[in-house]
Amino acid sequence: MNLIQTLEKEQFDKLSAGKTIPEFGPGDTVIVNVKVVEGERSRVQAYEGVCIGRSGGGINESFTVRKISYGEGVERVFPLLSPMIDSIKVVRRGKVRRAKLYYLRNLRGKSARIVEKKQDRTAAVAAAE
């Protein structure tokens, strides 16, 4: 390992020490709880939408979440290890065949829906026990 990789690994371990980051990918609906500072007060705001892509790797990894707010599409890019992210929760898994879902920007209504990924029987039985 060279010096840069060593330093990045140390930073990655330090930043991800207190967090549990779930496994999620493009097509998954996620709720990202973001810390918002307004003046002297801070609060946690939930941002729910579809993950349309992940980019980068290691300490520089980020993901893009798209939601429809009052009929207008809103996208937000979050660094995965940002201290402003309180928590990430996966609401549902989407079945997609692409790594980047930028085509959703051009779709409206029912055509913009993503099919939910079905659990196989063995995983469902294991989860029930």
Curated annotation (Swiss-Prot):
It comes from Rhodopseudomonas palustris (strain TIE-1). This is Large ribosomal subunit protein bL19. This protein is located at the 30S-50S ribosomal subunit interface and may play a role in the structure and function of the aminoacyl-tRNA binding site. GO terms for cellular component: cytosolic large ribosomal subunit. Keywords: Ribonucleoprotein, Ribosomal protein. One of its GO terms (molecular function) is structural constituent of ribosome. InterPro entries: Ribosomal_bL19, Ribosomal_bL19_CS, Ribosomal_bL19_sf, Translation_prot_SH3-like_sf. Belongs to the bacterial ribosomal protein bL19 family. PANTHER family: LARGE RIBOSOMAL SUBUNIT PROTEIN BL19M (PTHR15680:SF9), RIBOSOMAL PROTEIN L19 (PTHR15680). It comes from the Bacteria. NCBIfam families: rplS_bact. One of its GO terms (biological process) is translation.
